[in-house]
Curated annotation (Swiss-Prot):
Protein name in UniProt: Flagellar assembly factor FliW 1
Lineage: Bacteria, Pseudomonadati, Campylobacterota, Epsilonproteobacteria, Campylobacterales
Gene3D superfamilies named in the record: BH3618-like
Coiled coil: none
UniProt superkingdom: Bacteria
InterPro entries, per the entry: Flagellar_assembly_factor_FliW (IPR003775), Flagellar_assmbl_FliW_dom_sf (IPR024046)
Keyword Cytoplasm listed: yes
Species, as recorded: Helicobacter acinonychis (strain Sheeba)
Entry's transmembrane regions: none
Length: 129
C-alpha cells in the first residue's frame, strides 16, 4: 500500500511517498515509492516484542488525521543483523500509519518522558516481560 509521508523519517526528509508491504505478523518492509530512490527499511511490530505505549503529540494527530481513523498501525525501524538475535529496534522514533487516509509519519519521542525507550535496543531484550 502507498502512503503519503506527512512527517518525514529523520534523515530522509526528501521522500514523500512510501510503500508498505507486510512480510508476516511481526515484520514489514517500507520502501520509497519515488523514482531514483532505493531507500528501504525493515519494520517490526513493537507490540509483538514488548509492552509499548506512548502519547501521539497533537500536531502529529492532526497531520495524520488520526482522530477519525479506524485503521492505524504503529511500527518501528529495525536494523537487521546476522544472526537475527543481534538485530536492534528503534523504540524512540516509531512510525505511525493511517490506513484509512494512506498517511504516515515518524514521531520522535521525548527521551526524558520515555526513558525506557532507546534508539538501539536489542530485539530480544524484552522477550521475557
Amino acid at each position: 500500500m502507498l502512503f503519503d509521508v506527512k512527517v518525514p523519517i529523520l534523515g530522509f526528509e526528501t521522500i514523500h511517498k512510501m510503500r508498505l508491504q507486510k512480510i508476516d505478523e511481526i515484520f514489514l518492509r517500507l520502501s520509497s515509492a519515488e523514482e531514483n530512490s532505493v531507500v528501504s527499511f525493515t519494520l517490526v511490530n513493537p507490540f509483538a516484542l514488548r509492552k509499548y505505549e506512548f502519547e501521539v503529540p497533537t500536531p502529529l494527530k492532526i497531520l495524520l488525521e488520526l482522530e477519525e481513523a479506524k485503521s492505524v498501525l504503529v511500527a518501528n525501524i529495525m536494523v537487521v543483523q546476522t544472526p537475527i538475535e543481534l538485530s536492534t529496534v528503534n523504540y524512540l522514533a516509531p512510525l505511525i500509519f493511517n490506513f484509512d487516509k494512506q498517511l504516515m509519519g515518524q514521531v520522535v519521542l521525548d527521551s526524558n518522558k520515555y526513558p525506557h525507550y532507546h534508539l538501539r535496543e536489542n530485539i530480544l531484550s524484552h522477550t521475557h516481560e
